[in-house]
A protein has these predicted regions:
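Glycine-rich phosphate-binding loop signature in dinucleotide/nucleotide-binding domains
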Residues: 44-46, 97-102
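Domain-level recognition of soluble alpha/beta enzyme cores
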Residues: 124-159
Length: 220
């Protein structure tokens, strides 16, 4: 099994005097979101073995902040190809990974991140807000075999859904969902049954599971 974590960069600082989209840094809110997601990914039992990030400053800062918060120790590489990339181009970067890693986090942009998630699970509309993370499990032994439609979406969460006291409850819910999806994939592989239709997961609201949702961020 290979696991892909698609992490959209955190909210960027539009007021930063950079004069260059590539150099735009994270806003304070973006840093906070990246820290939340770094801790959550580790709590959800999927700390990445390796990371790939866009060369944009906001993406590199997102990875660095999330890795520090989550205690990730795996190596990371910067890929210029992930900046203004197509979903297919990012997929090629993933396929080029070496098989000693089972979980890889990919830090990128919109609409590429949501497009790649949809491509991997075989279709469906997926929306990734800033600093949102999508976990996709692919029942293969080699990254080279990761292909469109072969993945199963285990979860998709924005940072606004994560309150500090909600981590444990969410972890239990996610563990159950992951186990159920794995069993479904394994059963389908054994009997050659058609895969489940792609689905859009129910969105969790900003600020916690009981709070109203927030607006999507505009930038990529």
């Amino acid at each position: 099994m290979k696991t892909i974590l698609l992490l959209r960069h955190g909210k960027s600082d539009w007021d930063a005097d950079t004069g260059d989209d590539h150099a735009r840094p994270l806003a304070t809110r973006g840093q906070k979101g990246a820290r939340k997601m770094g801790r959550f990914i580790t709590t959800a039992r999927v700390p990445p073995d390796r990371a790939i990030t866009s060369s944009a400053v906001r993406a590199r800062e997102t990875l660095a902040t999330a890795a520090e918060a989550g205690g990730w120790t795996g190596p990371a590489r910067v890929a210029d190809a992930l900046y203004e990339a197509t979903p297919e181009a990012v997929l090629r970067e993933i396929q080029a990974e070496t098989d000693d890693a089972d979980t890889v986090v990919v830090v990128g942009h919109e609409p590429t991140s949501s497009g790649l998630a949809s491509l991997l699970v075989g279709g469906g509309r997926i929306e990734m807000k800033t600093a949102a993370v999508a976990r996709i499990d692919v029942p293969v032994e080699s990254w080279a075999d990761v292909a469109p439609g072969r993945g199963a979406l285990a979860f998709l969460l924005p940072p606004g859904a994560l309150r500090p006291n909600a981590y444990r409850k969410l972890k239990k819910t996610i563990d159950k969902a992951i186990d159920a999806r794995k069993k479904a994939v394994e059963k389908a592989e054994k009997v050659g049954a058609p895969k489940e239709k792609p689905y859009k997961p129910a969105s969790l609201p900003r600020g916690g599971v009981d709070a109203p949702g927030g607006p999507a961020d505009a930038q990529g």
